[in-house]
Structure formats: structure tokens, C-alpha cells
Amino acid sequence: MQNLTLLALDTSTEACSVALLYRGEKTHINELAQRTHTKRILPMIDEILANSGLGLNQVDALAFGRGPGSFTGVRVGAGIAQGLAFGADLPVIPISNLTAMAQAAFELHQAENVVAAIDARMNEVYFSQVVREKVRSDFGEFFQWREIISEQVCSPEQAINQLQNDNAFRVGTGWAAYSQFTEKNLTGSDIALPNALYMLELAQVEYLQKHTISALEIEPIYLRNEVTWKKLPGRE
């Protein structure tokens, strides 16, 4: 779909990124913006739309990194996505940050078996393993990622015990954060943080399958249970 226009944003980690698919071309802005996501993300969105001469109401759908990641970052991303989508009446596509890094591994390194570990602090990682598969449906043939280890928060030891093989491509900050991984020669790669650029392809597949939600259905995914999420005031 050459005419599909998608906007993606991610604030789930210390990286802050936005990306745009417009007329078949992808553009993106990516910054390290620890603790300044709330100040940077809206100007970045304004900039990327202005560079293409677009207004938010000309976007077909909004994708966002729904977690896991830092509590504050995931919450900011969900809140910004909800506000933008509600204001412009946009359908929303939540994207897993772990799967977005797997997509980066495919686009940059042709990896099709990817294990992700984001440092979750407290001697834990956000962890999953996915493989890229061709799928046939009423919407045609496309590729999607299938989980072989479900998204979870776990200790490095628990992650190691679940690994299907040592040959999967490794992404995320978790590998370098804990000695348990390095002792097993499980090192990371050049893909350490999620980037909205690699959410665009995932979002396009979801959009074509009509897998979208409304602004009011947005739910951040923390993978830890002690955090509550408040929707827009008066819309609980």
C-alpha cells in the first residue's frame, strides 16, 4: 500500500524515537533522551510531520511502543499515543518493544531467530524469543514474528535456562548488564534499544489485517504488576 501513512513513536527506554511511513518512504528521528522524553517527543513528532508537509490528521494510523521498558518511559509513550490518537481520531497499533528489536535485527542483519533481553533492573530482564515466519491469510502473504519464549520479566538465570539455542541473534541492553550472561558467552549486538523506525513494518502488517485499537483501548505493557495505568481523565 503505497498510499498508507503511518506514524510510530517510542519512549520506552532511554532512547526516544519517532518514525514516519509516507508514500512508501521511511524517515525517522532517534535521540538518547533519558528523563526528557516528555519534553522531546512532541517536538520530534511535529518535526517529522512538518518535514513531509503533513498534519497529524493526514496519518492513517499511529503505532507506539507499548512496552516492556522503563515504567516511566512506557507510561509516557502510552499517554502521548492516547492523547494524539484521541485528538485526531486515529486507529492505534500497539507494538512490542522486544519484537521491534527483532525486526531491527532482521532489517539490519537478516536475522530470523531473535532473543531479546532489556535490562529491567533489580537483577531482572524483560525477555522473549521470536522467529520470523511467512503467513498466508485472506489479506495475502506476509511475514510476522511468532513467540517461542513468551514475553516475561525474569532473572538472567531463568532466561538462560529457557534459551532454545545459543545461535539466536541477541538484542537488547540486558546481555551486557549482567555477568551471568557474559560468563556463558551470551553477548549482545549493535541493537541495544528499540527504535520506532523498525515498528513501521510491524505496524503495516497489523494495519493491513485490521488489527487496530482505539485510543481508549490503549494499555501499556509493564510485565511487572505493581504499576497501575490511568486513562484520559473521565474516560476510565
From Swiss-Prot:
Annotated SUPFAM superfamilies: Actin-like ATPase domain
Subcellular location: Cytoplasm
Keywords noted in UniProt: Cytoplasm, tRNA processing
Record's keyword annotation contains Kinase: no
Predominant localisation class: cytoplasm
Record-level GO BP terms: tRNA threonylcarbamoyladenosine modification
Gene3D superfamilies per the UniProt record, alphabetical: 3.30.420.40
Signal peptide: none
Alphabetical list of CDD domains matching this protein: ASKHA_NBD_TsaB
Database matches in InterPro entries: ATPase_NBD (IPR043129), Gcp-like_dom (IPR000905), T6A_TsaB (IPR022496)
One GO CC annotation: cytosol
Keyword tRNA processing included in the entry's annotation: yes
Family the entry assigns: Belongs to the KAE1 / TsaD family. TsaB subfamily.
PANTHER family recorded: TRNA N6-ADENOSINE THREONYLCARBAMOYLTRANSFERASE, TRNA THREONYLCARBAMOYLADENOSINE BIOSYNTHESIS PROTEIN TSAB
Its job: Required for the formation of a threonylcarbamoyl group on adenosine at position 37 (t(6)A37) in tRNAs that read codons beginning with adenine. Is involved in the transfer of the threonylcarbamoyl moiety of threonylcarbamoyl-AMP (TC-AMP) to the N6 group of A37, together with TsaD and TsaE; this reaction does not require ATP in vitro. TsaB seems to play an indirect role in the t(6)A biosynthesis pathway, possibly in regulating the core enzymatic function of TsaD.
Name this protein carries in UniProt: tRNA threonylcarbamoyladenosine biosynthesis protein TsaB
